[in-house]
Amino acid sequence: MFISEIQLKNYRNYEKLELSFEDKVNVIIGENAQGKTNLMEAIYVLAMAKSHRTSNDRELIRWDEDFGQIKGKLQKRNSSLSLELNISKKGKKAKLNQLEQQKLSQYIGVMNVVMFAPEDLNLVKGSPQVRRRFLDMELGQIAPVYLYELSQYQKVLTQRNHLLKKMQGNSKNEETMLDVFTLQLIEHGAKILQKRFEFLHLLQEWAAPIHRGISRGLEELEIVYKPSVDVSESMDLSKIKEVYYESFQSVKQREIFRGTTLLGPHRDDLQFFVNSKNVQVFGSQGQQRTTALSLKLAEIELIYSEVKEYPILLLDDVLSELDDYRQSHLLNTIQGKVQTFVTTTSVDGIEHETLKEAKTIHVTNGTVDCEIDRE
């Protein structure tokens, strides 16, 4: 799949923009704070209906405006689709071929993207929240039902935490309501956990050989899920629910005392092992970056295996963060099969066949000039 054009209105520092793209490589060049990352983000938001940079949608709307809009034309193997996302203070509305989608979960997954930005290099050594977000965003693209369960879980979690805060003063009158929220949380949480196990099993299958290739056969990568309760991938849904129920019963008084939910998918984490050593603790910066690169390349192949089309790859100021070897490995892997967007302050020092026939887009303070290089 590839995006052939995009239109922005009141998006970040873009008042109005119409731009067409090549189906292979597009290089976006500009100094810092000119709008190249905003353009990259707009493509991501069009696909995912949320930003990878902020959870506050108001930040996506141009200063002093009430709404922002992103439109795009997506070319898939057997169809051409128009996508539209309207952002206002009231929320977001998505359209597919001019038809408004009742739920964002019906819209997300139509256009698949993989974002690789400098912050993704922190996937290994960053906070557990970074790794959970990675799981949620990637899994949501190939399993819309996961996004539904996640949104329901988050609603119940907010209500349950509010009740636990209230119960810190007087717990006796609210225990029945707490039990209701606990059962609802278990219902959604168990399904989230099961989907994460399934996804990570697939990710492991793709990431391990990719990592082996990048490390020239010297390293074996293993991805381990660390749940907040004693469950395993082999358990069925009913067993996971049973373990959750018993675990919540055992921490009930502690949760009331603390005023917050102590168990569940929102407390889980991922660990990465290279040659049986925890990369987060014992890995070199090079191993951590190889692990992050392996995961991103694995995402591309995993999405292809699930939807039978390659996703769009967004490389936001990340090539300069990789050494020549990892840079070449990345570009060799995607060459000719994945529509790729690259942002950079300069192409100097990036010598690769993939960039030779790229469309070059120069961004200066929210305006663009385009050219196609044919060297």
UniProtKB/Swiss-Prot annotation:
GO terms for cellular component: cytoplasm. InterPro entries: DNA-binding_RecF (IPR001238), DNA-binding_RecF_CS (IPR018078), P-loop_NTPase (IPR027417), RecF/RecN/SMC_N (IPR003395), RecF_2 (IPR042174). The keyword Transmembrane helix does not apply. Keywords: ATP-binding, Cytoplasm, DNA damage, DNA repair, DNA replication, DNA-binding, Nucleotide-binding, SOS response. Its main location: cytoplasm. The RecF protein is involved in DNA metabolism; it is required for DNA replication and normal SOS inducibility. RecF binds preferentially to single-stranded, linear DNA. It also seems to bind ATP. This is DNA replication and repair protein RecF. It comes from Bacillus cereus (strain ZK / E33L). The gene is recF.
